Amino acid sequence: MRLARARTTNSVARHLAPLFTVGLLIVAYIAIFGLLSLRRHQNLRTNALDLGYTDQAVWNTLHGRPFRFSTYLDAAFQLDIPVQHFEKPDVLLGYHVEPILAAISLLYLLHDGPETLLWLQTVVIALGAIPVYLIARHRFGSRITGHESPLESRFVRWLPVAFVPLYLLSPPLEAANLSDFHAVALSPALLLAAFCFLETDRPWGFVAFGLVAVTCKEEVGLLVAMMGLWAAFVRRRWILGLCVAVASAGWSILSVLVIMPHYSGLDASPFLARYGQFGDSPAAILQNLVQRPGLFLDWLRRPDVLRYLGGLLLTSGGLAVLYPLVLLMALPSVAINSFSVYDWMHSGGGHYSASIVPFLMIAAIYGVEWLTRMTGGWVKARRLVRGRSVFWSTSLALVALGLCIALAYHHDSGVSPLSRRFVLDPVSEHAQRAQPLFEWIQRLPPEVPISVGSNLYPHVAHRERVYLFPTVSDAQFILLDVTGPSSPVGVGDQRQIVGDLLDYAQFGVAASDHGFLLLERGLDQYRFSPTFYDVFHAAGAHPQVAVGAGWSSLLLLEGFDWEVRPVVRPALSVEITTYWRALSPLDDGYRLIFYFWDDDRHLVRVQPEELAVHWFPSWLWEPGQVVKLTLPPLPVGDLPHVGVAVLLPRTEDSDVEGRLMPITSTTGKPLSLWDQDTILELVRP
């Protein structure tokens, strides 16, 4: 009796072990990416576009103002969409149709903040691993005959688990997870669940999850429509499939041609401008697709587009190519991304490719099963070896190969601890010193309008009117981080606007600390506090790489830091921080220019250091004081050479005569100098 009970217990444990492993992988993903996403927000690296405005729209929805936000209201800036021409620029439905945000707003009853959105996004993405596992188990389980050896039985149980890390480590999902919050990032799990229900003959689940998926974004209806066609033509569920296809495609068309124009006042989606190279209207684009297909084919031959398409396949370890029929279901999103003139959409970064991942995973599962079944049948027909053994051994080989390829691609392009891009930053002193300002703003009555810089917007968005600086309108307060991204304007324009506001618009400085500015309308105070410049001071700093290079006995470069940033894009993004010391008073406003070369000595990029010009010019540097200057993250990490030059005022970046010379070593170590010894190379060890 005890022996039988023990055998039963062992049998249950063996069968539950794969599912338990899937659960552990999901929990690990949630813990790691939840922390990464939260830490990114805590360090002021989330932005108005898109966490800030989504958070405000969700908060307003909960408070009886559905889908209202003020990010683009009275916009004093230009974007790649015509926000100035919107009839109702304060209604989100004019930009995207994402009804799921109304349901998400109820979660704010539990925790009222953008952290809710970030954790929700992480958890839902992770839960997509469950239908991946179930789809694989269903597909490979159909090959079980009951005559497998113990080894083959164990393999049957564990093979589906291999597709879970393939999903969780896909760079497009990780990119979406660490790109603020987007409702469309919730769609992969919903699409996978819908497909799982379809393939296991539970149409109610297919319809239910498909219905929720289409509420994530206007284009997701096209993906569900393609799944409906799969149900009709592959699964032979004609009525179910065609009804779902027509309803879902109809919803997408209604969203783009009716709902969005109703609120925007435009003829169609405002994002149609990103496809202007193919026509100025949906009808013109379709006409050109039929009459001038070469126009589209030429676009697909662009190196950046080919690289993007190849990266998608590598996400599945290349296994998705084994079952191209499934990949057809992803065609709408692939086309939307590939044909866009906005290169971020076909970079593999951001949230744009998240909804493609489900079909890559399904194609990988079906492709492995199909090829191994064909191989096993061919071998068995020729009586070479047991066909069933060939099936399982071929499956193992294919999955192992696919995982190796996917892991290699993930190491290069992902952002998990297994990637070269992984970074878990501590909460910085700069972010900590922003908290008193956030708390002060949050104590203001919610009807008081404010204007905020992009990276501070998500932290103070819970009020009816929060403008994105440089829009001021009727704002009573302006809150800026001058070291953060100045977009949608340049650093120089930002500084000019602040100066004009202080000089002519009756604003004064209410607080200034560590690079943060709080301006108040009607205040008679125009000086920055001494602590405002603390963000540029680095007393006692220890650069990663010591340099010791002097410029004409005026400036000393003590060293630099080279920090990789966790951004999914073809090129490695890095943040370069340099440490300088003025050796004597600097009367002129010197400029720092960074140059990036390839191995063939071709100049690839020129990047000016703008903070030192506009917010902390060199004539403010005290002799002997260490000054820290950080460039914004740049996609230059794979370039082998970077150099810096000190330019005299009012000289061009390429003007050799305008560069400060000579450059000499203060440590006795040789320096690597470029371009007539006017540029110092920052040599990494």
Model-identified regions with their sequence ranges:
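Membrane-lumen/periplasm interface segments of specific transmembrane helices
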Residues: 32-36, 43-46, 233-331, 365, ...
